[in-house]
Regions:
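Extracellular/oxidizing-compartment recognition motifs
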Residues: 1-195
Length: 195
């Protein structure tokens, strides 16, 4: 994971402005071969948005624009950029994601080492380079959304219909982290609510 920013990039009017973020990845680089990988989600661009909860308000295709600038000890620099030589897969464990409607995650589809050098991507598809107006690509100016604290449930109980309820004792913005075990194909459903 690069950085501590969450839900990036933030909302913007994508037809007029696309914000980029910068990160120092020096501590993540290793001697020998390295790999760059990214997970893309629907976010504000393609997810449900607005009072009508319309999808694809700005477009229906996800895209990644990436540039890695390497400065060697001897002063040389090298650029690694996302281009049509990259590959992508939509067969990973995240089956659906939406800022309002949550995420469907199928652990049976996890790809061990997908973000490591030497991963066999033979069954991945080639990506297509998209043209865009470079004038609308700007640095992010707003502060990042970051985690501020971890809150534990104040009460865990069963509802009359057998659902497990975690009461955090306050309104909050966030998500639940949990460990589960069970047979392959078992389903766990988390629903967040303000009660």
């Amino acid at each position: 994971r690069v950085g501590d920013a969450l839900l990036t990039p933030g909302w913007t009017t994508y037809r007029h402005r696309i914000q980029y973020q910068t990160y120092d990845v020096t501590d993540l680089l290793r001697n020998g071969e390295n790999a760059l990988g990214a997970l893309l989600g629907d976010g504000w661009y393609r997810g449900h948005l607005g009072f009508q909860r319309q999808r694809n308000m700005y477009g229906d295709r996800l895209a990644l624009l990436l540039q890695l600038q390497i400065r060697y000890a001897d002063g040389r620099t090298e650029l690694v950029t996302s281009d049509s030589n990259w590959k992508a897969s939509n067969r990973g464990p995240i089956r659906m994601n939406d800022l309002y409607w949550g995420e469907e995650y199928d652990a049976r589809l996890e790809k061990e080492g997908w973000d490591q050098a030497g991963f066999n991507d033979a069954d991945w598809q080639a990506v297509r380079k998209l043209d865009h107006a470079k004038s609308i690509v700007v640095a992010q100016v707003a502060p990042n959304v970051v985690r501020h604290e971890e809150i534990r449930p104040q009460r865990i109980f069963q509802s009359p219909n057998g659902q497990t309820i975690l009461d955090f004792g306050q309104n909050m913005v966030g998500w639940v982290r949990l460990k589960v075990s069970g047979p392959a194909g078992a389903t766990v459903t988390l629903t967040h609510a303000e009660v």
